[in-house]
Amino acid sequence: MIEQIVKEINICLENECFLSALGMALTLPDICGKAEYPTDGVTKRYIKWTNEYISAYEKDDSPYGIDMPYLSGEVLYNLRNAILHQGNPNIVSSEIKDIRCKVDEFNLVIGSTFSGDTSSVHYGNDQQIVYRRLDVNIVNLCTKLTRTAEGLSLIHI
């Protein structure tokens, strides 16, 4: 089943149906999470799977990246719910617990897979964070999710 879903996501991307591709891609952590953590609830397994297989490679814990927002499991789960249940391509920061990922501005952008996600932080005079922004490349995100799901499906599903 994963192979067919990935094939259809890729067809959507090739035909520039970016929101359709994203909506389907955001279901992959549900499917893979169910296979990997069958006894966990939906929210827990989605976030857990995403944190383990996607977010672990997005999070920058270097001194220059420690404040930067990133694609956490919470962010992707929030985006999944917004798109699939509300038709809204935005996230609700108040529902995200990780302070680092509570963004003031969230944008979905369309570009090639070579164009990654960007995050920025603005500091006030007292070096306190006053603004966080996260731009997520739809094609890049779909590619990360599909390739990860395909790779893991060979092992688990």
Which residues does each predicted region cover?
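Anionic, Ser/Thr-rich low-complexity intrinsically disordered regions
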Residues: C17, Y37-G41, N90-L108
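Short runs of predominantly hydrophobic/aromatic residues within well-ordered alpha helices
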Residues: F18-A25, G73-L76, I138
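Histidine-centered, metal-coordinating catalytic motifs and their short helical/loop contexts
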Residues: P69-D98
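Conserved small/polar residues in nucleotide/adenosyl-binding loops
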Residues: I155-I157
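Short, hydrophobic/aromatic alpha-helical segments in well-folded domains
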Residues: I5-E8, M24-T27, L79
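A contiguous, mid-protein "functional segment" used to position or interact
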Residues: L108-S153
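Short, contiguous, well-structured surface segments enriched in hydrophobic/aromatic residues
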Residues: L19-D60
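Charged alpha-helical initiation segments
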Residues: M1-L19
